[in-house]
Amino acid sequence: WKNLPGTDGKQHSWDDVSHQDFVVVVFTCNSCPYAIDYEDRIEALSRLAQESDSRFAVVAINSNQIPEDSLQAMQKRSREKQFSFPYLTDATQDVSRAFGAIRTPEFFILDHTRRIRYMGAMDDTAEASHVKEQYLLDALKALKQGRAVTVTETPPIGCMIRKARKKRYRP
């Protein structure tokens, strides 16, 4: 991605995080109950990424095209929740299409060559207190240790990304 506006008022691109060994890209939004359920877990992951030996970064991207997910609404949400990760808007939806993302939240781990090493759900349930399988953290741990990821894809849990509608009918 290039020049995606962030809630911090800056433009962001892959180059901002390309020095990391791994980048966690999460497609999320303000309006999906599942995405809201994951906000604290995404923030915890971001704080983990900020540790000196983490070797990864977290970037959140909102591709929804509804008023509740406007950049202004995202800025408000980011301030309220004090997000420590870049929260970017994908107004053209080009980035979500390029990744093949269909739900919020949906997680991807990319290596420094931009190869997707994991995609899908962060864990096995939206209810934080009932998590048994931590797919994303397990994949990150394996990658950081130079091991193969055993589970490379899981079905994402969440709401469909709200794509921009194009009128096809012309009278």
Question: What does each model-found stretch correspond to?
Answer:
Residues H19-V23, D53-A57, F83-F85, H112:
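Loop/turn elements at helix/coil->beta-strand transitions in domains of secreted/extracellular proteins
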Residues I109-P171:
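Thiol-/selenol-based redox modules, centered on thioredoxin-like
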Residues S13-D37, L140:
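Short active-site neighborhood of thiol/selenol oxidoreductases, capturing the structured segment around
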Residues Q75-M119:
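Short, internal strand/loop/helix patches
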Residues I36-K81, A91-A98:
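Structural microenvironment flanking redox-active thiols in thiol-disulfide oxidoreductases
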Residues W1-D15:
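N-terminal "domain-start" segment that seeds a small globular fold
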